[in-house]
């Protein structure tokens, strides 16, 4: 495996910036810190990872004990937890700007679903938080949400009149389209396969908890064939995992 692929992999999953390998530091510690930082960035909640271990001999990594703290207004300590994550990096990296992940496997994913007095669940709130963050950072991927944000930030606009004069185009289109990148092209990542061996849903409504168990859950390809910016991958993964609680 070439060194460039190792460097790209060090910012896998939940990452905020493109940093190259630090000669004086540990790749495993760096990966761990980036996962925790990105978990917090997208959800606003504390993300914790016990250990990250990357092997350049097998082009793979293993993450142990990954948790995301629950919203403070709910009872469960964590909204989700994963005991082990296995990551298989593609042996063939055709481009220095696109890192390909063959497969990510979660051994056991636990999601705690709770509703407040108004009937709104912690999952709904977190999905909204993550979606809004993604829409602000990557409006071209979330045009509908981005358009709502734009309208809220510009209350002087007459939404109804605007819709009549500019159906699905105009200012909103201009606002949501990708901005031209300045300087070097940004590295991207794609995940070909995403599998969850065991999914445990703890659903609490009106003080009563129901346990639902599912096995061999497949999440859609993330990043398509061309990949998406590495900074975006973390939010997309969180969003996909939380949406499993709604299916």
Where are these regions (language model features)?
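N-terminal type II signal-anchor transmembrane helix
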Residues: 1-43
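Short, functional N-terminal and low-complexity linear motifs
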Residues: 2-7, 51-55, 93
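Generic alpha-helical scaffold signal
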Residues: 29, 57-60, 76-81
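N-terminal leader/targeting pre-sequences
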Residues: 41-73, 197
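Secondary-structure transition motifs
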Residues: 68-247
């Amino acid at each position: 495996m070439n060194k460039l692929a190792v460097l790209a992999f060090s910012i896998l999953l939940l990452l905020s910036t493109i940093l190259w390998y630090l000669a004086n530091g540990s790749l495993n510690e760096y990966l761990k810190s980036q996962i925790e930082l990105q978990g917090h960035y997208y959800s606003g909640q504390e993300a914790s990872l016990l250990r990250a271990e990357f092997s350049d001999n097998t082009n793979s990594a293993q993450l142990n004990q990954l948790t995301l703290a629950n919203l403070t207004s709910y009872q469960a300590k964590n909204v989700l937890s994963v005991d082990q994550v296995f990551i298989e990096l593609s042996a063939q990296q055709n481009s220095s700007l696109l890192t390909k992940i063959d497969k990510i496997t979660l051994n056991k994913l636990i999601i705690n679903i709770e509703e407040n007095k108004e009937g709104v669940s912690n999952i709904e709130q977190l999905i909204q938080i993550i979606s809004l963050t993604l829409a602000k950072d990557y409006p071209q991927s979330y045009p509908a949400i981005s358009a709502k944000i734009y309208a809220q930030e510009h209350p002087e606009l007459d939404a109804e009149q605007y819709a009549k004069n500019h159906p699905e185009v105009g200012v909103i289109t201009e606002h949501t389209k990708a901005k031209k990148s300045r300087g070097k092209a940004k590295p991207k990542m794609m995940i070909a396969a995403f599998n969850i061996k065991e999914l445990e849903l703890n659903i609490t409504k009106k003080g009563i908890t129901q346990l639902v168990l599912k096995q061999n859950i497949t999440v859609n390809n993330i990043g398509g064939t061309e990949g998406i910016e590495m900074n975006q991958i973390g939010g997309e993964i969180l969003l996909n995992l939380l949406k499993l609680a709604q299916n």
